[in-house]
Amino acid sequence: MRPSNRTPAQTRPITITRQFTAHAEGSVLVEFGETKVLCTASFTEGVPRFLKGQGQGWVTAEYGMLPRSTHSRMDREAARGKQSGRTQEIQRLIGRALRACVDMKALGENTIVIDCDVIQADGGTRTASITGACVALVDALNWARGKGIIKSNPLKFLIAAVSVGIYNGEAISDLEYVEDSAAETDMNVVMTETGKIIEIQGTAEGEPFSHEELIELLGLAKNSIREIVDVQKAALN
């Protein structure tokens, strides 16, 4: 039995609220149960120096957690003077995932910076960030097309992400914090809207997991991501 009484394959309630802030070209509040992340997409003309003159764009991401997004207050990383390894790993993951769904040539020499700020954390912040950031990215691209900055739609497909794991010997989807902290296996999966894999991050926290369990976890992730993409599409429509 899961602490929330969810079935093994059941995700938490997921909501996506677009245009959550006034200034960003794309702005989304994404909620996976009690995990809440603000995702903004900022569109700027021009690209980093290493891409100048190549006729293609760039998508990158930054990630952070507010001091009281967790049960006890943590210091801001800016106050500590450096980002943690975890933060760097997560923002690179978000950036890689989003670059997979954008045609950089169609984007032209323009840059989109995604900022994912965790307001409240209850497990799955990186997967929620990717899911919300994709919708914010779509809005930023539509803004640029509306302004005539880009001519064609650079978006190749929607992407979404979910955590899966083995908890009390059972494969489950969309782990909340109490499950994540006690899971025997923890995995983050990013897929396209058609179920193709973009990235898998999987670790055996206790006992090693079998090939059969891996296939079961990926099947759970695929089904959950299909449902999450439906939420994205409903928000965009």
From Swiss-Prot:
It catalyses: tRNA(n+1) + phosphate = tRNA(n) + a ribonucleoside 5'-diphosphate. It is an enzyme of class 2 (transferase). One of its GO terms (biological process) is tRNA processing. The keyword Ribosomal protein does not apply. Keywords: Nucleotidyltransferase, RNA-binding, rRNA processing, Transferase, tRNA processing, tRNA-binding. The keyword S-adenosyl-L-methionine does not apply. Signal peptide: none annotated. GO terms for molecular function: 3'-5'-RNA exonuclease activity; tRNA binding; tRNA nucleotidyltransferase activity. Phosphorolytic 3'-5' exoribonuclease that plays an important role in tRNA 3'-end maturation. Removes nucleotide residues following the 3'-CCA terminus of tRNAs; can also add nucleotides to the ends of RNA molecules by using nucleoside diphosphates as substrates, but this may not be physiologically important. Probably plays a role in initiation of 16S rRNA degradation (leading to ribosome degradation) during starvation. Belongs to the RNase PH family. This is Ribonuclease PH. It comes from Shewanella sp. (strain ANA-3). The lineage of its organism: Bacteria, Pseudomonadati, Pseudomonadota, Gammaproteobacteria, Alteromonadales.
